[in-house]
């Protein structure tokens, strides 16, 4: 069940159902390389009139994303393993931030038990700085 009534906090890790690609590549569905499927996300802002700003978390390394400073590594110890999500290094993809409806967001469960997880503040700060780079506003960052 989606998080309709839950007020997520910055740094909270949830699951987002981005949906699937449209079979016809029509603009009414997702088009590659847009984000699809259910995946972990980190909450960046939950005060957007019913929308939640999130950044997706991926287990696939992208060297260009790392080199450009858009992908922030998350140590395998920061995300609890569940029956679905194994323990591995992951990356937050800051160039793929998106505002999504609460109806797309779900709590993470393991064997029927809800898991509440938050990234440390220093990791969230790295993500926020990477987003500034991704929107081509690096001049706003302290050198």
Swiss-Prot record:
Pfam families: PemK_toxin (PF02452). GO terms for molecular function: DNA binding. SUPFAM superfamilies: Cell growth inhibitor/plasmid maintenance toxic component (SSF50118). It comes from the Bacteria. Signal peptide: none annotated. To E.coli YifN. This is Uncharacterized protein HI_0080. The lineage of its organism: Bacteria, Pseudomonadati, Pseudomonadota, Gammaproteobacteria, Pasteurellales.
